[in-house]
Amino acid sequence: MRSPSELWFRLKQEIGNAASFLHAPALAAGFTEIPQAAILPDPDSFLALLSGSDYAANIELLAGMICGHRFPLLGSVVETGLEIRWRRDFARGIESSLKYFRRISYLDSARAGDHKFIWELNRHQHLIVLAQAFRLTRRREYVDEIQVQLESWWEQNPWLRGINWASALEVAFRALSWIWVDHLAGRALNSGIRRRLLLELYRHGVYLERNLSVYFAPNTHLLGEAVALHALGSLYPELPRSAVWRRAAAGVVQEQMERQVRDDGSHFEQSSYYHVYALDLFLFHALLNPGVSVVFRGKMRRMAQYLSALTSQDGAMPFLGDDDGGNLFHPYGDRRRFGGATLASCCAFFDTGEWRYDARDVAVQAAWWMGPGAFTKKPREPGPDAAPCLFANAGVAVLSNGPVHIVADTRGFGHAGAGHSHAHALSVVCRKADAGIFADILIDPGTFTYTGDPAWRSRFRGTAFHNTVRVDGLDQAEDGGPFRWLNKPETIIVNWTSGLEFAHLSAICCYRGITHERQFLWIAEKGLLAIVDVVRGSMGDSHPHLVEQFWHCGGEAVAASPGVWRIGESATVTMPVSALVEVFSGGEYGWVSNAPGQKEASPVIVVRRTGVLPATLAVVFALGEESVADIAVEASEGTPRIVMGPARSITFGAGAPAIEWI
């Protein structure tokens, strides 16, 4: 039920849009061509530091592809041909109309195409690459291509018509791209093109001021829109209403920092990928608004700490929750390592070497945002393993952060409808390094699609596509649509105990009359990760239930001996010989998506048990020199115990487990 304030807000919004549609915003006839405010760093101050680098070579390579209308998008290459049809889904051959933007059914992929792929191209982030290539090489062809594409876009996307005006966030992304194009190549544009660019930037600002997603999507959508509106007001102070934009948008960004970022630094979407988006947005805003509060900066710092903890030593980040394949500034390269550029930028902003990143990450973002000073900061040197840590607000624990990287997520679901969350409460992911080279042991299979295929959308964000337990074939919450969960479970952290040698996490997930308790125990000295699940029903429940454990493997899963499976080259998982186990790739559950729109078969181990509750299941992952040939699971008076042979056992009671190892 919408409140009176929301109804009034939306009414004013639509009246304003309708009036603006009839009379498109225009600049005064005498409005002169204005320079961009000198806030962003002058590229000439650091371009010499990029000369001859792998990064510079890659920019030229990307620019060549873009000039040939071969666009790297979301892990694939879209070839548009000579004419770029900006409203076209090139994969499906569908092009939507030029109706008034509110009449575009962009969620209906059969009529509009997959809006995600259409919008990704229309963010115009590839034009930033062309502008960067121009500054690095001074080759005029890159500016010429920018001008041709801008004029083409303006012709095919008139004010408030068509799918590319249907999302305020996409308008914001495009505005930010054009800001960077103007900053890097504005003086090289023909005067008529640049005057038109200023007009279109002004129109984007008018649109954003009126269409902020205050009620529609008060998450990273609203944040991104406000950051872009503030940037327009700050970098173009001579535009009409620029002062209003700066003041209003800065207030929204401050409010969203307070609302969206928890005290432990985690973002409330419960998605690692969207955490990077949010941190980049807050950081860019802080660069343009040095008056942000100490509290604002403190939360940004904690966001960086959280991101650093989620990132393994080689810079890879697990995809917890949705990943949409994009990036605020440079959506190219290995998406799992996008966080490295963010951490490099945070180190430059906070003048610290607190976080680890690859030195090459500086060129991707920090250099362009903060200038040559970004190159003087040094990432944290490799050293002793970081201590296990718990982010209580997120419900995320990093049990090991060294050559073995283990992340457990007890909560799974984010704020409100949890639109970018997956049903993966009590799940775990794991990576391991051998001779310094990391390999995935347990993975999160990713996202695959948002609206392109509803059935696959439900699968990839469902419980069975994560390393947790499913009961009676049902997800932990009810699917309320592609961006909504209903009846989310209650999750509680029961115990967290950690030290140099071990980490123990116990948590409960309650839903549909089911209580699932999972305990994780990492024994660093032995390189063993023990996981025990106890599933209980409601009082008086005497019906049989199907309980399934899913283990999505990063490498091939091969039976090594009864009850033991080898995962890849350097890990094993052991479970009771009596367990009913199935291992397969593809089919219903065995898939991984490394980029939106792409999926491939991937091994999954499924353990099934049917019977009256309670049910106790346990596994032990061997990630070091110690091996586990077999295990037995005992559950006396509700106290699970894993027995791994004579004088080797783990008893899980209240508090930290009791370990016997002789």
Where are these regions (language model features)?
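Extended, charge-enriched "interface" segments that sit outside catalytic cores
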Residues: 16-109, 116-121
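Catalytic Cys-His active-site segments of thiol-dependent hydrolases/isopeptidases
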Residues: 442-446
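CBM-like, beta-strand-rich accessory domains located in the C-terminal region of large
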Residues: 172, 323-324, 331-334, 348-360, ...
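Short, flexible loop/turn elements at secondary-structure junctions
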Residues: 90, 401-403, 412, 469, ...
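Aromatic-lined, polymer-binding surfaces characteristic
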Residues: 97-98, 104-108, 112-301, 310-311, ...
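Boundary detector for helix-to-coil junctions that initiate low-complexity/charged tails
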Residues: 1-11
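Carbohydrate-active enzyme catalytic cores, enriched for enzymes
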Residues: 266, 270-441, 497, 610-617, ...
